[in-house]
Amino acid sequence: MTRADDESYVERLPKWFSPKRLLCLFCLVAIALYVDRGVVSSAAVSGQPPGGNDDQDASSKANAKGYGLQGDFNVDYAEYGVLQSVFVIGLLVGAPVFSELSRSVNAFTLIAIGLGACAVGDLGCALSPNFRFLLLMRIIIGVGEASFVALAAPFIDDHAPKGMKTRWLSYLYLCVPFGVALGIVYGGIVGTYLGWRFAFFGNALLLVPLFAFCATSEPIDLRKEDTSMLAIIGSY
């Protein structure tokens, strides 16, 4: 990119934009997305299937009632393991798709679309009538998450101050385990007192303002013309 191109790019940046604001926004998005991962891993949300678990004696297992998500849908631990990991299908399909779409569609807009998909997926989880529908919603969440996973790193690469790119990426990815841990705590509290459906519903509400901001704000363009390799790096 020539100096003239660089100056033209800077002039096109929206008024709300600054590199630090973008980093803060992406950190909030990462936390909100990975709170969902913690929620689905929370013991209060997962619950226990009817018949108890293998640590209980035979009489206790016979009288044990299920609770939480496993109890409501009569899901055993193996099936719940599938539920926890099925989002990867959506992530693996969505990441290269969003990467290629960023060549013709504004990448910031694609992130907004992904956040909307995650919010819809979490709302669908809260309203799921059966386990199969819940699996579908988890895949949709994976697709939505893929937009951020694929495109956030190229934005940081574009706008981090000189010599700070690695540090800024570390800040972004530090939000991943923080979001998961926060989701486990949040899911435990809400799942215990209000039920597992409210835990997913609350996470959908958390995503709405982030989606609204990204969808309605003047979008930012990626400086890079070819984002495919950066997207692959960002995915991991």
Model-derived features: positions:
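Cytosolic juxtamembrane N-terminal segment immediately preceding the first transmembrane helix
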Residues: 1-43, 55-56, 71
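Residue-level signature of mid-helix packing/kink "hotspots" within the transmembrane helices
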Residues: 38, 88-96, 146, 180-181
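Extracellular/periplasmic helix-loop-helix junction of adjacent transmembrane segments
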Residues: 44-92
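Helix-breaking motifs and short loop linkers at transmembrane-helix boundaries and internal kinks
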Residues: 74, 106, 127-132, 144, ...
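Conserved MFS/SLC helix-loop-helix module at the cytosolic interface between two early adjacent transmembrane helices
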Residues: 93-129
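Paired small-residue
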Residues: 121, 132-140
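Cytoplasmic helix-loop-helix junction between adjacent transmembrane helices
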Residues: 137-176
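Helix-loop-helix hairpin linking two adjacent transmembrane segments in secondary transporters
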Residues: 172-222
